[in-house]
Amino acid sequence: GTDTAAANAASADVGAISDTVSDGAPTVVTASAAAADENASKAAGTSNASDTSDISDTSDTSDAASCRFSLFSRARARSRVYGSSCRLLTGYEDRVAKKRSLYLLWAFLIPFVLLFCIYLSRAIYPFGNGSVLILDLNGQYVYFFAELRNKLLHGGSLLYSWSRSLGGEFMGIFAYYLASPLSWIVCLFPKAMMTEAILCLLLLKMGICGLCFGLYLHHRRPGSRYGVVLLYAMSAYGVIQSMNTMWIDAMYLLPLLAMSLERLADSGRFRMFTVVLALTLLSNFYIGYMMAIFSVLYYLCYYFSRHSLRRLGRFAGCSLKALWGGILAVMLSAVILLPAWYSLGFGKTEFQTTDYSFFQRFDFLDFFAKLLPGSYDTVRPEGLPVVYCGMLALLLLPVYFFLPDVKPRRKIAAGVLLVLLIMSMNMSTADIFWHGMSKPNWLNYRYSFAFSFVMLVLAWEAFRRSATVRYRQILSVGFALVCMIVVLQKFDYEYLSDYFCIWISLGALGLILASYYFVKNRAAAKRAGVISLSVVIVLEMFAAGLCNLSDLDDDVRFGKRDAYVSFMRRVRAVTDQINENDGSLFRMEKTLRRKVNDPLALDMKGISHSTSTLNAAVIKLLQQMGYSSRSHWSKYMGGNPVGDSLLGIKYIIEEQKTDGSFTDHELEERLYHAAYETENDLIAYENPYALGILYTAASDVLGVDFEEYTTPFERLNALVTAMLGEEETVQLFRMVNTESTYEGCSTSFASGHKKFAKTNADGNATVTLSARATTPGEYFLYIPSDYPREVDLTLNGAAFGTYFGNETRCILDLGTYESGQDLILQMKLKEDTLYLRNNTEYIYYLDEALFNNVMLRLAQGNVNITSFDDTHIAGTFESDASEGLLFTTIPYDAGWRIQIDGKTVAPVKTLDSLLAVDITALSEGEHTITMRYLPDCL
């Protein structure tokens, strides 16, 4: 009897500990062990009583002896119980640990391999010439990763970069784009394999999405659920937005964040919540902010679905812990948040005017359409939410609300959370709040993966409780979905293909219902049904992922690997030569380009750059100087000898034409000299007039206001005049009288502009500017307009590109002309109207003799830089009475600490954008200067 009781107790104990290993609830072990101990004790007590009576028949025993014997017997029985338990538990724990490890391994590998297969089917390198580079990943992120790799491997600073527009803080770029704990992976690849490094990064993040969602489901209820894990990792958001790799960190951290919130609501423990939220904010502060909003909603809905509303004291206590945990998370992530906020202060917060008015952003039927496979529409501003996460989820989500064993308040809380997320996307004002009070530029609804997460969690709950639901109810939901899909087909949505969306949806739904029938109603075929269901999910997610990437390619185009690798290899052959042979601090640019961020990957200190963490003042300065620069980007177009020399652009790389000539080479051959040539048809011209990054000038520069002038030529003349301290304007650029004629349009005047309007909307209209060269030299064009309308240009009868376009609103080099030659520039209207600023001239020529003289005078004030790195400059300079300003072409940033002769001096701002130092109080002679950079926030 004792042995039987011991065995039963051991079995109960193992079952209890099994629950503990799976659910992580040690209190269950204590209760079960106590019950087992009590049962064993009772069994032992019965046996002992019999033994005692037998002994009593032969000898007289005292109560004390009887008590001692009873305790001994009970201890012996307990020993048998726990001995059996331990022997059984040891093997069980090993099996549980092994099973859990395999489950998590597969949760990682399945989405990893499936996404790789999708890219493989798109002929990605090395199986073709494809790449993962698309949109901003192609134009921005790949260059940021290249700069990060260069800094980590070669000792650069994460605080500052000379490769963005004139130079600027780098922590903002790092905080928004590169702070993921996985970004360092790019250091494991050679720079020629940057596209493969990013592919590896995307695959790893996709695998971790599956792993973390698997951990969450295992936390809720242990077991293998590879299909549901795959639905989250390979959801439309994960596949499409993987090009914005910095957002995927929040996606894989969201399940852990939800797990931590559930733990906080159930037990009051907030350490995990603090750590996960901090990691989310550190990985990407922007999406981290959205996850903080989601945390509030999820915590409230989860708490009130699980706990009594009457215990307000408990709710207040847990909520205070949640608040304290959130504050700690913000404090832990301050090392990223503070530099990010500092970076945003350079102009991102003023980048656009946000409309906070309320309106509905989409119809709800449109939202339902986005729950289907192959429903990609666009990532452009008119795009709808990306919420597809599998037909199984769409089928089982309504089923959850029919579950009889789920309490009504849990269903209400789940419904409220879903409605809140949908309405957040649908209501414009709420959506802007989610996006940090700023309307996103393309790529809308950047938090939509949170909806997919909630949807999948509820679908999983319905799946594991499906035994409580009749199959006919599931079939009814399936029939309703079929009807909805047929209705959508009738509406003929442009982005819903009959084959790739409608038929895949119906086919997947039919196969899921068939597989579900065997899972639910045929015990003998249940395993086959589960396998069939898993296969359907894999095939559906593969097809949907492939369709999404194909549609994405049609929308915004994937870049070819060769286009990136060959361009970098070709240009790097020149830039590496220059950097190896010239150790001074200088800027370098090129007239050929792949993207505006090329300087970051080529180790060039240039002026071309594009990023969301923009410096608005520098972008405006470059635009005022005649370069192509606006919005959040600047590009080396509009280069001219005066502007280039003042900004310290010492080398200009140009491309040889197929006929052996060089593009726009006449001016360079005349003023510059060829410094480096390569075998791949590139040449680098050295500008002997390029000034240093720091040089002395007259303090009159502080009074220059570019807003007072209409054209870049006037501004550059005024700036040089102020630098020299001259009273009379130094006319480096001299205007040329022009005459304008027009055909096919009428004229009028509006707000300081001459307006040309087509007389026939379907006819041609042209405006012609005519001038005659008065002096041999280089002639330039700039036409100011506050209302630009793109036009086609012809110069002396030959096509000459466009003007007033997004990139072509800059100085144009018209070429070299002899005295008496005619310049006839014709503008053909592409729109109905054209506006040109009146009371100004549009064509100027460069006085090369005066230019030579002026630049030699300014060069005498160059600072002799003795050492420099990313955050440090040291040098010497000569000061005299005529030069009261140490002028720099370094963007103004309060993070620069400046010392002259060992004494700290305060910097001043010039031209509303550049750093300078007032040196009027210095004595004549040589002085030393030291500059160190550390953002104020650090």
Where are each of the predicted segments found?
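Active-site-proximal, structured, solvent-exposed surfaces of multi-pass membrane proteins
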Residues: 95-98, 144, 730-938
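Membrane-interface coil-to-helix junctions
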Residues: 112-213, 232-251, 283, 290, ...
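Membrane-embedded helix bundles of polyisoprenyl
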Residues: 111-115, 202-216, 223-305, 321-341, ...
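Periplasmic/ER-lumenal interhelical loops and adjacent helix-loop junctions
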Residues: 135, 139-148, 181, 318-319, ...
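Extracytoplasmic/lumenal acceptor-recognition loop(s) of multi-pass membrane glycoenzymes
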Residues: 163, 536-562, 576-647, 691, ...
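A cross-kingdom signal targeting lumenal/periplasmic-facing segments of multi-pass membrane
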Residues: 182-187, 211, 604-753, 758-762, ...
